[in-house]
A protein has these predicted regions:
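Adenosine-phosphate binding glycine-rich loop
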Residues: 25, 32-34, 46, 198-250
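Glycine-rich phosphate/diphosphate-binding loop of Rossmann-like nucleotide-binding domains
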Residues: 117-181
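A glycine-rich, Thr/Ser-enriched phosphate-binding loop motif common to dinucleotide/cofactor-binding enzymes
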Residues: 95-113
Length: 250
């Protein structure tokens, strides 16, 4: 029988999102304005900085900006990739956008991009999927990869055997046991599994994508915002589909 995927957290309801930007300008007070980023309504707080500004003052201004966003109803924020003051934002109740659901949803394109970069044909490739349980994204990735690659390895305690048996029955797939043939790519949906080949860690606040970078197929992203949290937000609120994404390999 078809194994049921384990519980999977549903992305939270989309709320007003903030942008915290350190901007070189005169003044001391953060300024809040409303804007749209790729169709998303956002509140941007401009935090004034200048060359030579002491670190403690910059952090204090970032805290003031975060507090202003929180009072306006913002709970999650986007920033530049190298934004230095996340602890100050978190101290005022803001948090980053969780990239895990998005990264796990695009596990298959990421795996295929890793194979292309390595020059490995799909029909000769072995891909491993690991995690602490058979989650919905892991199950979906396994079912999609079966017809596309030579071998799958399902490295999940307990539930993995049931999933492997179902894949063999449903697709006639060659599903190998963990610890055997070395995979070319490992898709890790959580900690604890064996990591061999090119390892894509699709979990946690900072997923490890082994130099692969999702980008928009058409049009660019704002250069002043970290791309992965923004793409995760667009995907979460239904403004982004897999067909609009291209995986750039570095």
């Amino acid at each position: 029988h078809k194994p049921g995927p384990g519980a999977y957290p549903v992305p939270e309801v989309m709320g007003l999102v903030g942008i915290v930007a350190l901007e070189e300008r005169r003044g001391r007070r953060p300024v809040v304005t409303e804007e749209r980023v790729l169709g998303l309504r956002c509140l941007r707080v401009s935090v004034p900085v200048r060359p030579g500004l002491r670190e403690d003052r910059r952090k204090r201004r970032a805290e003031q900006g975060a507090a202003a966003l929180y009072r306006a109803g913002v709970r999650r924020a986007l920033t530049a990739e190298d934004f230095p003051d996340w602890p100050a934002l978190e101290g005022q109740g803001l948090r980053s956008v969780d990239p895990e659901p998005f990264c796990q949803a695009i596990a298959v394109p990421l795996a295929l991009a890793a194979l292309r970069r390595a020059g490995i044909l799909r029909v000769r490739a072995t891909v491993a999927l690991s995690g602490p349980r058979v989650s919905r994204p892991l199950f979906a990735a396994a079912a999609r990869l079966c017809p596309q690659v030579r071998h799958l390895v399902v490295d999940v305690p307990g539930e993995g055997e049931e999933l492997a048996a179902w894949l063999r029955e449903e697709y006639g797939a060659a599903v190998l046991r963990p610890g055997g043939a070395a995979p070319d790519v490992t898709l890790a949906f959580g900690p604890g599994g064996e990591e061999r080949g090119t390892v894509l860690r699709l979990y946690g606040p900072v997923p490890g994508l082994a130099g692969l970078r999702p980008i928009l197929e058409e049009g660019g992203l704002p250069p002043d915002l970290a791309p992965l949290p923004l793409l995760s937000l667009l995907w979460e609120c239904g403004r982004l589909t897999e067909g609009q994404i291209r995986i750039h390999a570095t």
